[in-house]
Regions:
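Structural motif
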Residues: 41, 102-103, 127
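Hydrophobic pocket/interface hotspot
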Residues: 43-54, 82, 95, 130, ...
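Well-ordered beta-strand positions
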Residues: 36, 96-97, 122
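Well-ordered beta-strand positions in beta-sheet-rich domains
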Residues: 32-34, 90-92, 105, 114-118, ...
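An N-terminal domain-start capping segment
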Residues: 1-31, 86-91, 138-153, 217-225
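A solvent-exposed interaction/effector surface
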Residues: 19, 65, 109, 114-365
Length: 365
């Protein structure tokens, strides 16, 4: 019994000593981890810049299926944000500033603890050097938890290392794995839709499409509207010489919807037309490759473009359907005139056709 009392006393003294020691330790932390990723800098930057992609590489999210994310209208660029709840945490993340292809600064609140996150991107031999840094201050409870797990630098640093490795694998496979198939001539059905129009430079097309698609989906959710299919893009102008691209991000609807004047959302109707269909399976960054293959097929098969039709990209399978970019499906429809089909020959006419027998040449002796 006396031994048991001594054990309890030792345990009590240990807990008191640990508490005093932990409480005197600085709660400030500054953790940095880096990795070289074998992808172009703009590809890596754009992927990290969009909060919707974080579920594919953050180790603490991938290892906990209780995480539920909420994504607002803007999820990439300055002012972007997201929030989450899980069995043990609740928090939000916001992008404070962005320097295109160079750096991202963010503020995170997790279980009422605030931290600052910095991302830096630099070209290097073999790809892009990505540096992930986090600064913050721990409360007493978090300091105790960190103490028993090797310290905050070890806890956060290990998670960052695992996440950066996940990011490297994700970008290496998910971004670089794709296929393009020219399906051939099809009839593209028409229908009603709501759209938002934008002009921009070619280098900004992909980023702006992501932003506008997210806004359109948010508009439908906010107004409790149902779409009649997948979002699609109509290209009105594609002037490479002047670097001027005009397009509309569209969401199909079952019936015509009246939109009040002054709104940046408009309604429209797409007529059905004959088109050359090409399917891209993979990340949107390979869209230009799919376009080139479609145009080459069109030229090789002497297809005539129908300029009265609309060039359309349909996001048949997107990020809301599956997180893996390698499984996304984009359908491209280029309007063309139907190829003329030779008129079938009437077999009866052939059978009854009288062929004149050529005269036999004769000679007079």
């Amino acid at each position: 019994m006396r031994i048991l009392k001594y054990l309890f006393l030792l345990l009590f003294l240990f807990l008191i000593g640990t508490s005093v020691f932990v409480s005197t330790q600085k709660g400030d932390y500054d953790v940095t981890r880096s990795i070289v990723i074998k992808n172009p800098r703009n590809t890596v930057f754009n992927y990290i810049n969009d909060f919707r992609n974080w579920e594919t590489f953050c180790s603490w999210i991938k290892n906990d299926n209780t995480y539920k994310f909420n994504y607002p209208e803007l999820t990439m660029g300055q002012g972007a944000s997201c929030s989450w709840v899980s069995s043990g945490t609740e928090g939000n993340l916001k992008t404070v500033s962005v320097k295109e292809n160079e750096s991202i600064s963010q503020k995170m609140v997790n279980n009422e603890e605030t931290s600052t996150i910095y991302w830096n991107f630099k070209d290097t031999i073999g790809g892009t050097k990505v540096t992930w840094r986090s600064k913050g201050k721990l409360d007493f409870k978090s300091k105790v938890a960190a103490f028993f797990h090797g310290g905050i630098n070890s806890v956060v640093g290990d998670e960052y290392e695992k996440s950066l490795e996940n990011l490297n694998k994700t970008l290496d496979y998910e971004i670089n794995t794709y296929s393009v198939k020219v399906n051939g001539i099809v009839n593209r059905p028409g229908g009603f839709y709501l759209k938002q129009f934008l002009h921009c430079k070619q280098k900004d097309v992909d980023r702006n499409i992501k932003i506008l698609v997210s806004r359109m989906e948010h508009f439908f959710d906010k107004n409790k509207m149902s779409s009649n299919g997948k979002p699609f893009i109509i290209y009105h102008k594609y002037d490479r010489t002047k670097d001027d691209i005009g397009f509309s991000v569209c969401m199909p609807v079952r019936d015509s919807i009246h939109i009040m004047p002054g709104s940046d959302i408009e309604s429209g109707k797409l007529a059905s037309y004959t088109s050359l269909k090409t399917t891209l399976t993979g990340d949107y960054s390979h869209t230009q490759t799919a376009w080139k293959k479609a145009l080459t097929y069109s030229t090789d098969n002497h297809l005539e473009r129908n300029n009265s039709g609309q060039i359309v990209e349909v996001y048949a399978v997107g990020r809301n359907d599956v997180k893996n970019p390698s499984k996304w499906v984009t359908e491209i429809y280029i309007p063309v005139f139907p190829k003329s089909v030779p008129k079938p020959v009437n077999r009866r006419s052939l059978d009854s056709l009288v062929v004149a027998t050529p005269p036999t040449e004769s000679t007079t002796p």
